[in-house]
Amino acid sequence: MHKSANSKTRKQSKGLHPRNIHRNGYDFDALKACHPPLVQYIKCNPVGAATIDFANSAAVKALNTALLQHHYKIESWSIPDGALCPPIPGRIDYIHYIAELLGCPLPSGKINTANTCTNNAVKMLDVGTGANGIYTLLACAVYGWRCVGSDINSESLANVKAVLANNPTLNANISLRLQPNKDAFFSQIIQTDDYFDVSVCNPPFHASQEEASKGTNRKLHNLARSRNKAHTAKQPSLNFGGQHAELWCNGGERLFLKKMIKESQAFAQQVGWFTSLVSKSENVQPALKLIRKLGATEVREIEMMQGNKKTRVIAWRFKP
C-alpha cells in the first residue's frame, strides 16, 4: 500500500516471515541433542507441549545457543551475564525482510540452511551490534553477507570477537569497529572508502534505567499471568537482560531515531539503504516525516508480526 509517491507500507499477515524456519515452533528434541545444557530448562506447558520459562534468562540463553548451533551452525554462542538476550526468531525475521528489500534470495533457494559465505557482494553495517552480535552472525550465516558490527562498548565487541573465534567462516567475513563517540552512529565508523548496501539497527527504546526496569517487570508480569502465576517485584528486575546502551538512552527511541536519521544524510552516498527497527508505534510517523523532510528518494515502512507482537522496520535512501 502506497502512502505517498515515495513511501509504502507492506502489511503482513500474522506470523513470521515465510523464509523463517521458526514459523512452526521449536524442535526441542533436536535442540537438546545439539546443546545438552538446554535439557535442564525444558518443561511441559499446560497442554503438554515442551517449552521453557521465557522469564528465566539462563533458559533463554541456553535456547538461543541451541538454536544458533542447530539451525545456523554458529558454534559456542554466548553472552555475558546482564547482556541483552535476543529472541532469535524475531532477529532473523529482520534479516529476511532486509534481504527481500535488497532483492536477495536465499542461497541455493533453500529456506534457512546454514551457508558458507559466498555472497560477498552484499555488505551490511550493524549500528550497535551489542554483546550478542546477532544481526551480523545471522546475516553472514544465512545469506553470506560481509558485515561490520559497531558498538560504543568495547566489552560487548570483545564478546562478539570471542564468538567469532569459534566460527572461522564467520570470522573471515565479519569485522568489528569501536564507536568512540557515544552520540554518533555512522561518523568514525564508515570510512572514506567504505560502501554498505544496507545498515541495520535495533535502538534502545527506553529513556531511562527506571523506564527500562518497569518495561521488564511488565514483561515478567505478562509471562506470569500467561502461566497463571503471580509476579512479584522481588524477581530480578532485568531478567530479560540488557546493558545500559542496549536498553535505554537519554531521550529514548524517538530521539535516538531522530539523531540517526539526521546523521544518515551525510552518508547518503555510502549506504544504499538505511534501516532501523522501531518498537514504539508512536515513533514511526515522526521518523518518517523527518526522513522525507531531509529529501530521501524512497521510504519504506515494513510491519512484522511475531505472535501477537507487532514491530516495524523503517527504511530510507537518498538515491535512486
UniProtKB/Swiss-Prot annotation:
GO molecular function, one term: 23S rRNA (adenine(1618)-N(6))-methyltransferase activity
EC code(s) of this entry: 2.1.1.181
Major subcellular site: cytoplasm
Pfam families tied to this protein: Methyltransf_10 (PF05971)
The entry's keywords: Cytoplasm, Methyltransferase, rRNA processing, S-adenosyl-L-methionine, Transferase
UniProt-annotated stretches for the region Disordered: 1-20
Catalysed reaction equations from the record: adenosine(1618) in 23S rRNA + S-adenosyl-L-methionine = N(6)-methyladenosine(1618) in 23S rRNA + S-adenosyl-L-homocysteine + H(+)
Compartment(s): Cytoplasm
InterPro entries: METTL16/RlmF, rRNA_lsu_MeTfrase_F, SAM-dependent_MTases_sf
Domain of life: Bacteria
CDD domains named in the record: AdoMet_MTases
Record-level GO BP terms: rRNA base methylation
Cellular compartments per GO CC: cytoplasm
PANTHER family: RNA N6-ADENOSINE-METHYLTRANSFERASE METTL16, SAM-DEPENDENT METHYLTRANSFERASE
Recorded family membership: Belongs to the methyltransferase superfamily. METTL16/RlmF family.
Matching NCBIfam families: PRK11727.1 (NF008725)
Function of the molecule: Specifically methylates the adenine in position 1618 of 23S rRNA.
HAMAP family the record matches: 23SrRNA_methyltr_F (MF_01848)
Protein name: Ribosomal RNA large subunit methyltransferase F
Originating species: Saccharophagus degradans (strain 2-40 / ATCC 43961 / DSM 17024)
Gene name, Swiss-Prot/TrEMBL: rlmF
